[in-house]
Structure formats: C-alpha cells, structure tokens
C-alpha cells in the first residue's frame, strides 16, 4: 500500500489538506515578517553603530564634547540617562576601544554627545580631543551600562556626587529630568581641582538659577588666591550639612576618578546611607593592582611575564598593565566595553598561569572554577 493510501485512511487528513489549500489561496503571506524580531532587536541593541562627527564643542582647555550622528541618517538606539557607548578607534597602529558616557539627553535621538577629557596617561582621549575632526567616521557599540537613573524606582530626591568628568552622566540625567518636566529634586555636588576644570560651568549654573528643584554645589580643591567659591574636599560633616535631614532616604549617584568614588562611598557609609541607595559608575581603567588589598605585595608591577594566546602567538608584558591593554597593543583584539571588569564582556578562558582580578570585576562561580 502506498503512503498516500495510508494517509487517506487517517481520519481528518483530507480536511487538513483542504484547509491548507484554502489558506494558500486566501490566507495572509507572512514571509515579509521573517527575521523581523532580529531586525528590531538589532535596532535597539546593535553590536556596532556607524557614526559621523557632526560637531566638536570645546568645554575646557582639556575637554571637548564630540557630537556623533548616524552615518546613515537614522535615529540612534535609545538609552537610559547615565549609560555609555564603547568607541572603537585605531591609534598609533593599535585597534582599541574606550567607554564614554553619553552627555546628551535620552529624549534626543538624532545624536549622542560624548564629553571627553584628556586623561593624564591616556592616549585615546588625547587622540579624540586633539586630532578628531568634523566629518570623520567612527564605530561604537550600542548603549550599555548599569549606572543610570530609573525614574520609577529611584525616588524623588536624587544626589549626584561628581568629580572631574564625572559630571558627564550627571548632565544626561539632569537634562532628561528637565526636558520631561519631571519634578524629582536633583542636587549635583561637583568637585574639581581647578576653576578651569569645571565642565558645563555656565550651563549648569544657568539651569540651577532657572529650576528650583535643581541645586548645584561646587568645590575647588586647588583654588587660585582670588577664587570666591567653596574650596576643599568633601567630608562627612560637609555632606551632612548639604544633605540636611534624612540622607538615608535619598538616592545617590557617584562618578569620578577611582579615589574620589571610594572616598564618597566611605563618607556615605559614615552617614549610614544604605548601600542599596548608592550607584557607582565603574567603567574606565581599573585602579592600580598594588593599591588593592588582595594584591600579592612581593610582586613588582614592572615584573615581566610571557602571555601565550593559544594558536596565535605570544608576547612579553609587565604584570602591572591590564591584560586587555597588553593584548590590544600586541594585535589581539578582545570584545570589551567597560575596561574595568565590571561588565564581564572581555571574559576569556585562562588555560594556565594566574591572573589577578580587580575588586570591581564580577566573576561567576563557574569562572573561578573553570578559568
């Protein structure tokens, strides 16, 4: 007996064939929707964005805002105020990437503003500030990062402690609140070394005068003789005076150099602010390993080691240099984002040897067990 005779003997088979024929003649063709979910996901979370420098704005003698738009004239992926993108560049023959917080508001979809300050020991920031020009093209990741303002869960009383270029995500949060007419109180406590280091100085001061629910407090730690503003570093006493009653009920954001972040966390702990009410930005270069309590003190930072990339080659570097930097300098690119270990995107398998992991890196139990 043939297969067709067997199928015809199955109850309901002919009815199904008839229904299939009717659907083919009268039904809707959904083939155009094939891959639509993937296309939507890519538009929201692209692996790479093709960007063009639309404008360059000088903020301070060492800081510029780079305005980046889509090369294709498209709206850029949405982001949350406080997040960053990873910018990919080739500098002095090294293909590398650096995370930069988005300074513009999430309500602005036509461009991303990245405010970049030249780092003392950095070479990417110097390239971007000194050599980048309007019309130049770049690639970036999509927006990412856990450091952001959540208007639903972070309450109505927000305090941002910023040091130096740590004001960049603060600006994005502030503009987002103001442009959406959200009435959360926003207090920016902004610390800089010198008067001409203050980024967005005129803009922030003007907004503080215009909006009653935005408070700006500035400190200069190395003032000139004729400086009239507040000077010195933050202390628990100063913070207590600025925050008033019930500091435990406020939501705190901290962004600045690593020592600044650590100091602010300690001050808030002294004021008994719960850890759950503190958000700290962790992207950027990790702090020196010998400043961390888990570092083996008898190992010198300039001690040389050999790194072997299985099947691809080997090179010599020093133990004090982040492994990601060493790999990139020798032509081995590893997908990365935060560069501090916080996001874990650069995770690779350790076959043999020993690698020091900074405190901010989030290793899973399986990472520790299997390398």
Q: Would you name each region that the model predicts?
A:
Residues 1-30:
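Helix-rich terminal scaffold detector
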Residues 1-11, 126-308:
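FNR/FR-type flavoprotein reductase catalytic core
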Residues 35-137, 156, 192-194, 221-223:
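Ferredoxin-reductase
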Residues 301-335, 351:
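C-terminal accessory/binding modules appended to enzymatic or scaffolding proteins
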Residues 328-332, 345-371:
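Iron-sulfur (Fe-S) cluster-binding segments and ferredoxin-like electron-carrier domains
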Residues 338, 343-346:
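Short cysteine clusters
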């Amino acid at each position: 007996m043939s297969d067709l005779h067997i199928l015809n003997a199955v109850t309901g088979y002919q009815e199904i064939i008839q229904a299939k024929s009717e659907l083919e003649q009268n039904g809707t063709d959904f083939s155009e929707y094939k891959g639509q979910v993937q296309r939507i996901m890519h538009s929201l979370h692209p692996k790479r964005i093709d960007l063009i420098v639309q404008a360059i704005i000088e903020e301070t003698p060492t800081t510029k805002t780079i305005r980046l738009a889509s090369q294709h004239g498209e709206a850029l992926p949405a982001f949350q105020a406080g997040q960053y993108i990873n910018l990919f560049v080739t500098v002095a023959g090294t293909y590398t990437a650096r995370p930069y917080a988005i300074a513009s508001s999430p309500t602005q979809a036509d461009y991303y503003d990245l405010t970049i300050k030249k780092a003392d020991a950095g070479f990417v920031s110097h390239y971007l500030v000194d050599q980048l020009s309007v019309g130049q093209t770049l690639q970036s990741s999509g927006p990412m990062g856990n450091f952001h303002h959540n208007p639903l869960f972070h309450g109505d009383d927000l305090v941002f402690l910023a040091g130096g270029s740590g004001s960049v995500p603060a600006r994005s949060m502030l503009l987002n609140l103001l442009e959406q007419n959200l009435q959360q109180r926003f207090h920016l406590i902004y610390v800089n070394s010198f008067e001409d280091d203050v980024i967005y100085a005129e803009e922030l001061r003007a907004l503080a005068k215009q909006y009653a629910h935005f408070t700006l407090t500035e400190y200069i730690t190395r003032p000139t003789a004729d400086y009239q503003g507040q000077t010195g570093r933050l202390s628990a006493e100063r913070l207590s005076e600025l925050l008033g009653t019930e500091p435990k009920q406020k939501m705190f954001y901290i962004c600045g150099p690593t020592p600044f972040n650590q100091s602010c966390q300690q001050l808030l702990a002294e004021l008994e602010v719960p850890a759950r009410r503190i958000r700290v930005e962790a992207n950027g270069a990790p702090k020196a390993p010998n400043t961390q309590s888990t570092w083996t003190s008898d190992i010198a930072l300039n001690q040389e080691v050999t790194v072997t990339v299985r099947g691809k080659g080997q090179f010599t570097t020093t133990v004090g240099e982040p492994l990601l930097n060493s790999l990139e300098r020798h032509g081995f690119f590893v997908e990365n984002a935060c560069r501090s270990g916080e996001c874990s995107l650069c995770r690779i398998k350790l076959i043999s040897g020993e690698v020091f992991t900074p405190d901010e890196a989030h290793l899973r139990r399986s990472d520790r067990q299997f390398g």
